[in-house]
Amino acid sequence: MKKNVLIIFVLFITTQLSAQLTYKDVAPIFYKNCTSCHNEFGHGMPFMNYTQTSNYATSIEIALNENEMPPWSPDSSYTRFTHERYISKTEKDMILDWISGGATKGDTTKAPVPPVYTKYHINATPDLELTIPTFTSNASNDDSYVCFSLPTGLTQDRIVKAFEIVAGNPAIVHHVIVNVDTLGTTTDDLSGKCYQITGDFSLGGFAPGAPPTIFPSRAPLKMGIRIKKSSKIVLQVHYPAGSVGEKDNTKIRIYFYPVGTTGIRPVVV
C-alpha cells in the first residue's frame, strides 16, 4: 500500500512540475540549441521570443520526437566532433513537457535576455570579400547546381585563417561548396548542371546553420590554407527545385594571416 501511495505521489509531483513549466524555463534551451539558425538573419523561422516559438509548438514537438532537430546525424557513441548540435535528453524532455502542458507563457520578463545575432558571424572587416553576380535561380522542376568562378586578385600567396560564407538569399540557398582554382582558368557554369565543381582543392562549404570556419591562429598551434596568387575561388551553389525566379548574391568573406607569418601548419580539406 505504501509503495502504491509513493508511486502516485511521484506521478502527481511530476505532473505538477510539467504543468508549471513556462517559457522562461525553456527559453535558455532554445537559445542554446536553436536560435543560431532560428533568428531573423538565419535560414529557419525565428524562435527569439515566446510568440515566435509557441506559434510553432506542434512542429517543434514533431521535429524533436523524430530527432530531426537539431539537425545532427552522427552517433556520439562512436566519435565526437567540433560544433556538434546534440540536445540532451533532459533538455529535450523539458521542451516536450512544456509543449504538452500547453506551451504556457508565464512571466516572460523572467526569461533570460535573448542572444544578439547579426548578418555576419565574424564582424571584423574581411581581407577579401567575393560576391557572386546577382543570379536568378533557374531551378524550376529540378534542383540547380550553379558554379561561379571568382578571381581573387591576389598578387602574392596568402594563408587563410578564417572564412565565412553568407547566403545572399537564405530562403533558396540549400548549400555551398567552395574550391580553389590555383591556375585561375575556370569559368562560370550557370547551366544549373554544374554537378562536378572544378578547382584544385577544397576550401570548405556551407549549409544552413553552419558557423564560420576559423582555424587556430595563435601559438603553439597556428593552422591555415594557402591560396596562391592569381587563384580563383569557385562557389558551387545548390538551389532547390521551385526556387526559379528568386534572386541570390551569395558571398564569401576571407581573413588572412599577415604576410610573413611563420609556423603555420597547412590544412588539407
Where do the language-model regions lie?
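Histidine-centered active-site/metal-ligand motif
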Residues: H38, P170-H175, H238-P240
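Solvent-exposed, flexible loop/coil segments flanking beta-strands in beta-rich domains
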Residues: P112-I172, S243-V269
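Noncatalytic modules at the cell exterior or secretory-pathway interfaces
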Residues: V160-F163, G224-A241
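Beta-sandwich interaction modules
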Residues: D200-K232
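Extended low-complexity, serine/threonine- and proline-enriched intrinsically disordered segments
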Residues: N169-S191
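Bacterial Sec-dependent N-terminal signal peptides
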Residues: M1-D25
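Exoplasmic/lumenal beta-rich domain surfaces
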Residues: T185-G204
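Aromatic- and Gly/Pro-enriched helix-to-coil junctions and flexible linker segments
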Residues: Q20-F148, K232-Q236
